[in-house]
Regions:
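Alpha-helical scaffold/interaction cores of sigma-54-like transcription cofactors
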Residues: 1-165, 172, 250-815
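Short, low-complexity, charge-dense intrinsically disordered segments
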Residues: 166-168, 175-213, 220-238, 242-249
């Protein structure tokens, strides 16, 4: 029976808690993760944990035409003391595959740019489809500097391959064919070479795949060339660089051409196929490699971390090819040998070719690039010439403070602004704030203005308030700046800005136009298999009927979780759990849950860079017109410390905008979000009756039920109302004590520390406004900072552990 997936929640290894292992004699470089969607059957946790147990000290990653999985493997490998070797597998439109490993930061940038080119445009220059990637050998040759290539040979070394090549290789191949014939015939005819070249060029007609028309059976440019008076001269002239031809030849005959066109191609991948002739096949590969000045490189090309994952891989293969496991036939792997094998096992298999093992070790040692080398800078366009970003930010902040506080900036606010600006400068964040300011200013400068509002932890920042990114005065509401940014923790701030949902596209296209598509991209969102999707697709691949898979899907309660409850299957679907096939389907489904299905675009998280974003991470096209997004999601971005700009859509802002327009049109009242009266008694009378249908934040059944019980009479009461109807306060038994104290049914008692531990009002200053009941995350952080003397980093960890229901044991660590 397949074993359950090893998830991050089940890994009991402290990051950095293990010493680095001794160098192994071999490094696996052909590994794919589950981010080679429906091709890799193990995630980064499984792979890194298994690699550590097998004795590896380094581990390569080579997902197909993508860098989507490198950050996760990077993080998990480092946590286990392993060195991640960052790379990918390039699959060309000609049908050839290469392992590609950059040796430094510049080479990594070229590799990302290559993948971006394949994902953003077709070979004809048209807009690329989402998820597709067209990379030609010519494109690869333009980006190989510093990128070590390992050619993946076909299983059958005698197979005849057809590839599209630039016209200038036709004479090269013709000369090769001519020399072969001459060696056989022992003759050398003067002038024969040019004749043979012309014959080779003209013979292309029969080698091009058939089509419906006659002359168009060959590429149009080549056909025009052959109709010219001197086709040989046309083929050789440099003014025809884009003429291409189709070349058909055995793999061995293509190898010289590939070696000549790809100067960093120095290795052929050698692996066991377990078809009975592996020794002879690898020996022949070794001979071919030596003939071109190359070497073979050992790899098992693992598709999963352990043999037990082979059934899941079969299911993934069936899903990918839209068939069933029973009908997949030769599409499936013939055995379970494509798992991650240890260095000792690989040394046994490649005992006749120790240089193949050494080649893998040497290549891994040469490729020292790490994702930690990525240095991220925000665009410079937001800063006028002659001004430093920090100086310009301070100038805008103090000008905004004068507008926010027309009667004079209070001393406490001025002190807060100085402290925040100093920290922003120390953390090198001025451009980030200037970029947000630029986007918000664009929205408000439109005619009519696009309604927008900053929210989230950015409301804790006085700088954001003075820049008019947010509309909440943190001094008035005693908000904690450490919730937003802290010097103690190494993570970027997060500023979320909501825009009218009907006009957000204007903002997005402005960002693309201002910074360019190669410097701006939306974050990705990883679409994972949830229980219902998993049971439907696994069941279909395993041959279950649609009725059965639908019945099984209905037994899943909720959209999350990592298991299918057998009791629900038996009781609600009426199925016999003693059926071994059904139990196997359920076990495979549990393995599939949580696996990535594909990438989608984030709702609005933008990454902007000063240099080419395509040299930091590959960019691909979205399903929506004129949308492109990077291959990393918000967790990947956070892990690397890269900042993002959240350009979000909020339907209620559109509703409010139309409301304000109607007030202006019919009643002559010119109101904005900032000038709408906050303390209107008639409005609070309606809210106390629960009359809030369609009112943002208080329209749910739970909120409508709470309103008559809490009876808000001011704006801050509404803040408490929205916050208290949350899982945390409800499960923490904070709702009833607060309501009783609000109604006078319970005394308000706030504990005070002893004289030796702090001032008597230490907690009163934090909890007085909520009647001694902690409701907000900021209150928990403030208590930890003042009473428990936590550092900012520890207080933020406490906040995250309280807010995240999956963080079992994190609170106990901080006790």
């Amino acid at each position: 029976m397949p074993e359950p997936a090893l998830t991050p929640e089940r890994r009991h290894v402290e990051p950095g808690g293990l010493p680095p292992p001794a160098p192994a004699p071999f490094v696996e470089l052909g590994l794919v993760t589950c981010f080679s969607f429906l091709r890799g059957a193990s995630d980064a946790v499984d792979l890194a944990t298994t690699a550590r147990a097998l004795g590896y000290d380094a581990l390569g990653v080579a997902d197909a035409n993508t860098m989507a999985g490198v950050v996760r493997l990077h993080s998990e490998a480092l946590a286990l003391g392993l060195r991640p070797v960052i790379g990918c597998r390039i699959e060309t439109v000609e049908g050839l595959g290469f392992l590609a490993y950059p040796q430094d930061r510049a080479a990594y940038g070229r590799l990302c740019r290559l993948i971006s080119a394949g994902r953003m445009a077709r070979l004809d220059g048209e807009w690329q489809d989402k998820g597709a990637c067209d990379i030609s050998l010519a494109m690869l040759a333009e980006h190989v500097e510093g990128v070590h290539l390992v050619l993946l040979p076909p299983d059958d070394l005698d197979a005849v391959l057809t590839i599209a090549v630039e016209s200038n290789v036709v004479p090269f191949v013709a000369r090769g064919d001519a020399e072969t014939r001459r060696r056989k015939e022992g003759v050398r005819a003067e002038g024969a070479e040019e004749t043979e070249i012309a014959e080779m060029a003209c013979s292309r007609r029969s080698r091009v795949p058939s089509s419906t028309s006659g002359e168009d059976e060959m590429p149009a440019a080549l056909a025009a060339c052959l109709r010219s008076p001197d086709p040989l001269r046309s083929l050789r002239e440099p003014e025809n660089p884009h003429i291409s031809a189709t070349l058909t030849a055995p793999f061995a005959d293509l190898l010289p051409h590939l070696a000549a066109q790809l100067p960093t191609l120095k290795h052929l991948a050698a692996s066991y196929l377990y078809t009975g002739d592996d020794l002879a096949r690898i020996a022949r590969l070794d001979e071919l490699a030596r003939g071109q000045g190359m070497a073979i490189l050992a790899t098992n090309l693992p598709l999963y971390h352990a043999p037990q994952r082979r059934p899941l891989h079969d299911v993934m293969t069936a899903i990918r090819h839209k068939t069933t496991v029973a009908r997949a036939g030769h599409l499936l792997q013939p055995n379970a040998e494509r798992h991650l094998k240890g260095p000792e096992e690989m040394a046994r298999l490649f005992a006749p070719w120790p240089h193949a093992l050494q080649a893998a070790r040497d290549l891994a040692d040469r490729c020292r690039f790490s994702l930690e080398e990525l240095r991220y800078e925000y665009p410079e366009e937001t800063c006028p010439d002659g001004l430093e970003p920090q100086d310009y930010l301070e100038q805008l902040t103090w000008a905004g403070a004068a507008r926010r506080y027309p009667g004079g900036v209070p001393d406490s606010v001025a002190d807060t602004l100085r402290r925040e600006l100093d920290l922003i400068g120390k953390l090198h964040l001025p451009r980030y704030f200037l970029t947000i300011k630029d986007i918000v200013d664009f929205a408000r400068a439109q005619d009519p203005p696009i309604l927008c509002q900053g929210r989230g932890s950015a409301a804790n920042s006085a700088v954001c308030y003075c820049l008019e990114i947010t509309a909440v005065d943190p001094a008035k509401h005693a908000l904690l700046f450490d919730r937003f940014i802290s010097e103690d923790r190494n993570e970027p701030p997060d500023i979320d800005v909501d825009f009218e949902h009907e006009r957000r596209e204007e903002v997005i296209q402005y960002i693309y136009a201002r910074y360019g598509r190669h410097r701006a991209g939306l974050c990705a969102t990883v679409i994972h298999y949830r229980p219902r999707m998993a049971i439907r697709e696994v069941g279909k691949a395993m041959g279950l009927s649609e009725d059965v898979t639908a019945a099984l899907a209905k037994t899943v309660w909720g959209g999350h979780g990592r298991s299918i409850k057998e009791a629900h299957v038996e009781r609600e679907a009426g199925m016999d759990l003693s059926d071994p096939h059904l139990r196997r389907v359920l076990a495979l489904t549990e393995q599939m849950i949580g696996m990535p299905r594909h990438l989608s675009q984030h709702v609005g998280g933008f990454i902007l860079t000063q240099g080419l974003l395509t040299e930091t991470v590959p960019i691909g096209n979205g399903a929506m017109p004129d949308r492109s997004f990077i291959e990393w999601d918000k967790d990947d971005i956070d892990a690397l410390g890269i900042l993002k700009v959240d350009v979000l859509a909020l339907g209620m802002l559109t509703c409010i905008r139309k409301c304000l327009d109607l007030l202006q049109a019919h009643h002559g009242q010119d109101l904005t979000l900032a000038t709408v009266p906050r303390e209107d008694p008639v409005v609070y009378d309606m809210l106390c009756k629960g009359d809030s249908l369609g009112v943002f934040q208080v329209e749910s059944r739970a909120q409508m039920n709470m309103l008559p019980r809490l009876r808000p009479r001011c704006f801050y009461d509404l803040v408490i109302e929205v916050a208290i109807v949350r899982p945390g306060p409800i499960q923490g038994d904070m709702v009833h004590p607060y309501l009783k104290r609000r109604r006078g049914e319970e005394r308000v008692e706030i504990p005070a520390p002893g004289p030796q531990h702090g001032p008597p009002d230490e907690l009163t200053s934090i909890l007085a406004r909520t009647l001694g009941v902690p409701i907000f995350q900021e209150q928990a952080m403030k208590i930890a900072l003042d009473a428990a003397k936590f550092t900012g980093l520890e207080a933020n960890r406490l906040r995250k552990s309280i807010a995240t229901f999956r963080s079992r044991g994190m609170v106990a660590e901080l006790e």
